Amino acid sequence: MVTFLEKISERAKKLNKTIALPETEDIRTLQAAAKILERGIADIVLVGNEADIKALAGDLDLSKAKIVDPKTYEKKDEYINAFYELRKHKGITLENAAEIMSDYVYFAVMMAKLGEVDGVVSGAAHSSSDTLRPAVQIVKTAKGAALASAFFIISVPDCEYGSDGTFLFADSGMVEMPSVEDVANIAVISAKTFELLVQDVPKVAMLSYSTKGSAKSKLTEATIASTKLAQELAPDIAIDGELQVDAAIVPKVAASKAPGSPVAGKANVFIFPDLNCGNIAYKIAQRLAKAEAYGPITQGLAKPINDLSRGCSDEDIVGAVAITCVQAAAQDK
């Protein structure tokens, strides 16, 4: 069976996108860059000091990568001024802007903002906030997006559930305590993201510890309210809740717990009530079910600026870059 990574990589190859990788002090970034270039998935911009990059790379073939050093880049003043204009209402000075633009992640995100690259992948050596803060400050949310959020593509080997074992988990990386409205909006955009990346019809489960009233509390009431709002926002998308995980994916359990549900027993998009649940769930799937986990990938930003887990492999970075290419192409339309 062709894996999700293989499918998304083949799609990315046809798109001719350029992705910036700012964590050039981490060997995994350079290993991933070499693989991406060898496979023809994307053009790569490595942000950092050229001598340091080449010393760390050793025998890796990065000859096709463009290396951009924020300290010597000919457009650095343009970048500094652009950031100053974006953030001067917050009280920053040009000196502050110059210091911030010396940060490789901030610099890479500004490259995306100014159209010099199509997206950014970072997070192997930084916390999620170090990647997502520049994204929110510089590229901001996309037109029409209620909020930015983050998801994981989870691909479980030898799994009969979901879309041939592939699922989308959201929010698993960004919105800590979403409101009822936030969860509803995350559900709708996640369905559209799943369709874009996995190329299958989304079936969205609003997850809970309860199925269809089996328990009642403020927590279940919030999930029910989010479900109703999401259904109103996107009546053409199959969204249902509240559902426990077994009812969401196992047909026999669904028939017993949620008969007549358009989603139960066949869900492929999992919407969690908060970041605690979403993040715990993805790591359980990754570590115990040996699932491939790609993310946290952002949605709702004006440009694709994507995060990584600090425990990621070089192949995880390759996957995130391929996803970023597909997202960028979709935003071009």
UniProtKB/Swiss-Prot annotation:
Its EC number is 2.3.1.8. GO terms for cellular component: plasma membrane. InterPro entries: P_Ac_Bu_trans (IPR012147), P_AcTrfase (IPR004614), P_AcTrfase_dom1 (IPR042113), P_AcTrfase_dom2 (IPR042112), Phos_Acetyltrans/Butyryltrans (IPR050500), PTA_PTB (IPR002505). It is an enzyme of class 2 (transferase). It is a peripheral membrane protein. GO terms for biological process: acetyl-CoA biosynthetic process. It catalyses: acetyl-CoA + phosphate = acetyl phosphate + CoA. One of its GO terms (molecular function) is phosphate acetyltransferase activity. Keywords: Acyltransferase, Cell membrane, Membrane, Transferase. It is found in: Cell membrane. Pathway: Metabolic intermediate biosynthesis; acetyl-CoA biosynthesis; acetyl-CoA from acetate: step 2/2. The keyword Nucleotide-binding does not apply. SUPFAM superfamilies: Isocitrate/Isopropylmalate dehydrogenase-like (SSF53659). Homodimer. PANTHER family: PHOSPHATE ACETYLTRANSFERASE (PTHR43356:SF3). Belongs to the phosphate acetyltransferase and butyryltransferase family. This is Phosphate acetyltransferase. It comes from Methanosarcina thermophila. The gene is pta.
